[in-house]
């Protein structure tokens, strides 16, 4: 396998190079005419374009994971100062489940179809092993720590080192508490259900 980092609006491939193209949570960040025209260009006749987009899901947190006043103030301050979303057009071109098939057809694809993949991550569900349940909880921990690190990279000038350290400590303490609840059999039934829309079109 070969990995190439490139511009999705100017792919470094000849016309008609591929039988299938797959994009995973990319389309919502790129101007549609530029994105779909490139997908169409690099596909062979009869080739398949698959566009995967995160759809609405369900998120219910355990009480022990609720933000403290310190954390709420931190995130409110970060939201006011950080322009990363606007700067990089994050989610600027997001469309709903009805609009996506229409836009794919508009830019040249035919035989459009859709499907959904649903994944539920509920640590307390007995269908999951203890190892898997702990991995779910820790995955949320890593996501929380990554979010703090993202603020540190984007706007470090607005926060002290002590604030970042405290945010990290609080995040770890919360997820340590959640793991302790799981290990003691104290069920919380917190859950994260992700829904991914797959739109399929043919050149």
Segments from the language model and where they lie:
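Conserved SAM-binding strand-loop segment of SAM-dependent methyltransferases
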Residues: 1-10
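Conserved Rossmann-like nucleotide-binding pocket used by diverse enzymes
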Residues: 4, 22, 50
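Structured loop/turn residues at beta-strand edges in well-structured enzyme cores
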Residues: 6, 16, 192
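A short acidic, Gly/Pro-enriched loop at the edge of an enzyme's catalytic core
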Residues: 9-21
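A short SAM/SAH-binding and catalytic strip from SAM-dependent methyltransferases
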Residues: 19-33, 55
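A short glycine-rich, Lys/Arg-flanked "PGG" loop and its adjoining helix->strand segment in the class I
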Residues: 33-48
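Conserved catalytic/acceptor-binding region of the Class I
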Residues: 51-142
């Amino acid at each position: 396998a070969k990995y190439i980092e490139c511009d999705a609006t100017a792919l470094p491939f000849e016309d008609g190079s591929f039988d299938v193209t797959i994009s995973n949570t990319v389309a919502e960040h790129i101007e549609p005419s530029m994105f779909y025209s490139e997908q169409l260009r690099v596909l062979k006749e009869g080739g398949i374009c698959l566009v995967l987009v995160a759809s609405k899901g369900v998120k219910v947190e355990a009480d022990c994971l609720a933000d403290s006043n310190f954390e709420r103030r931190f995130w409110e301050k970060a939201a006011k100062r950080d322009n990363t979303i606007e700067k990089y057009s994050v989610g600027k071109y997001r469309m709903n489940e009805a609009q996506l098939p229409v836009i794919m057809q508009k830019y040249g694809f035919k035989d459009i179809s859709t499907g959904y993949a649903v994944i539920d991550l509920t640590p307390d569900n007995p269908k999951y092993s203890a190892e898997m349940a702990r991995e779910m909880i820790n995955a949320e921990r890593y996501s929380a720590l990554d979010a703090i690190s993202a603020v540190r990279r984007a706007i470090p000038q607005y926060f002290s080192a002590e604030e970042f350290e405290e945010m990290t400590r609080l995040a770890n303490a919360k997820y340590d508490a959640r793991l302790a609840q799981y290990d003691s059999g104290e069920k919380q039934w917190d859950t994260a259900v992700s829904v991914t829309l797959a739109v399929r079109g043919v050149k």
